[in-house]
Swiss-Prot record:
Protein source organism: Pelophylax lessonae
Modified residues (Phenylalanine amide): F13
Name used for this protein in its record: Hemolytic protein B9
Protein task: Shows hemolytic activity.
Domain of life (superkingdom): Eukaryota
Tissue: Expressed by the skin glands.
Keywords on record: Amidation, Amphibian defense peptide, Cytolysis, Hemolysis, Secreted
Cell compartment(s), UniProt: Secreted
One Gene Ontology term, aspect cellular component: extracellular region
GO biological process: defense response; killing of cells of another organism
């Protein structure tokens, strides 16, 4: 799980 994706998910959700 890439930190970039985690950041995007954190922004959306």
């Amino acid at each position: 799980f890439l930190p970039l994706i985690a950041g995007l998910l954190g922004k959306l959700f």
